[in-house]
């Protein structure tokens, strides 16, 4: 029986910042948030912080976001390694074209023992979950049989690596959308804010909304000055959403 894969979002990379020594400026932040402020001040050469209302990094970045000067957010980035995500969810995720992706290849990686992701509404209902599991098990059994027969059919063609790829790329057609995938996603701060605004909404599919919320929690830990304006709240059904009073791109 297929195992249910839990969603996991792991931070694997983030921006570091080194201020040029010939610029007389200091900040109370580091990393990506400091880079955002530096880029913004570089536009106006406001190194002396003439406006006391934007003298700290947090107030400066908040002002940048509030007035919609989003381009300076593009200099800093974060990378996540995401597992426990369904193939159907990544079909939605990769529509965000400002992200960079590296995803598990079903041509190179056999899916005989792949885990699955149970959709919301099914995962907490024993009868529906049993039906779901039976369907995914049947798909995986068909995949395994197709794979074995295709490998036998192609036994005298090309190299062993080529034969495996050809067999897997054909057999994968019967795998369900619920098949777990694994993906590295890199995006700049502007792209992440857009993703959160779009996908942490109550109008988004619940699986990708969960992903957006988990990413947001880790983004707040990395750069609270840039992401803490988003507030996470629970809906009546127990799922979570995130909204911001500041300017966002949708």
Curated annotation (Swiss-Prot):
Origin species, per record, is Mycolicibacterium gilvum (strain PYR-GCK)
Q: Into which EC class is this enzyme placed?
A: transferase
* Residue span, ThyX domain: 7-233
The Swiss-Prot or TrEMBL record describes its family as follows:
Belongs to the thymidylate synthase ThyX family.
Concerning Gene3D superfamilies, the annotation shows: 3.30.1360.170, 3.30.70.3180, 6.10.140.450
Q: Which residues bind dUMP?
A: 92-95, 103-107, 172, 199
Gene Ontology molecular function: any one: flavin adenine dinucleotide binding
SUPFAM superfamilies in alphabetical order:
Thymidylate synthase-complementing protein Thy1
Among InterPro entries, the record links this protein to: Thymidylate_synthase_ThyX, Thymidylate_synthase_ThyX_sf
What keywords were assigned to this record?
A: FAD, Flavoprotein, Methyltransferase, NADP, Nucleotide biosynthesis, Transferase
Write out the pathway annotation from the protein's UniProt entry: Pyrimidine metabolism; dTTP biosynthesis
**Under which name does UniProt file this protein?**
Flavin-dependent thymidylate synthase
Subunit info?
Homotetramer.
The EC number of this protein is 2.1.1.148
* Described function: Catalyzes the reductive methylation of 2'-deoxyuridine-5'-monophosphate (dUMP) to 2'-deoxythymidine-5'-monophosphate (dTMP) while utilizing 5,10-methylenetetrahydrofolate (mTHF) as the methyl donor, and NADPH and FADH(2) as the reductant.
Q: Which GO terms describe its biological process?
A: dTMP biosynthetic process; dTTP biosynthetic process; methylation
Q: Which reaction does it catalyse?
A: dUMP + (6R)-5,10-methylene-5,6,7,8-tetrahydrofolate + NADPH + H(+) = dTMP + (6S)-5,6,7,8-tetrahydrofolate + NADP(+)
């Amino acid at each position: 029986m297929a195992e249910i894969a839990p969603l996991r979002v792991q931070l694997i990379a983030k921006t570091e910042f080194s201020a040029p020594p010939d610029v007389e400026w200091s900040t109370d932040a580091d990393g990506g948030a400091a880079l955002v402020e530096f880029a913004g001040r570089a536009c106006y050469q406001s190194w002396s912080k003439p406006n006391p209302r934007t003298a700290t990094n947090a107030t400066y970045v908040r002002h940048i976001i509030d007035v919609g000067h989003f381009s300076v957010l593009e200099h800093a980035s974060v990378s996540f390694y995401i597992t426990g995500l369904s193939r159907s969810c990544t079909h939605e995720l990769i529509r965000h074209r400002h992200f960079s992706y590296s995803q598990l290849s079903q041509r190179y990686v056999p899916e005989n023992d792949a885990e699955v992701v149970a959709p919301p509404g099914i995962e907490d209902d024993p009868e529906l979950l049993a039906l779901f599991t039976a369907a995914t098990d049947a798909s995986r059994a068909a995949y395994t049989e197709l794979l074995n027969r295709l490998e036998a059919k192609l036994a005298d063609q090309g190299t062993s690596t080529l034969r495996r790829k050809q067999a897997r790329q054909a057999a994968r057609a019967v795998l369900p959308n619920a098949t777990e995938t694994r993906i590295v996603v890199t995006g700049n701060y502007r792209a992440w804010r857009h993703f959160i605004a779009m996908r942490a909404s109550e109008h988004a599919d619940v699986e990708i909304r969960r992903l957006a919320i988990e990413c947001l929690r880790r983004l707040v830990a990395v750069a609270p000055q840039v992401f803490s304006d988003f507030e996470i709240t629970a809906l009546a059904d127990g799922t979570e959403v995130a909204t911001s009073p500041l300017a966002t791109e949708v």
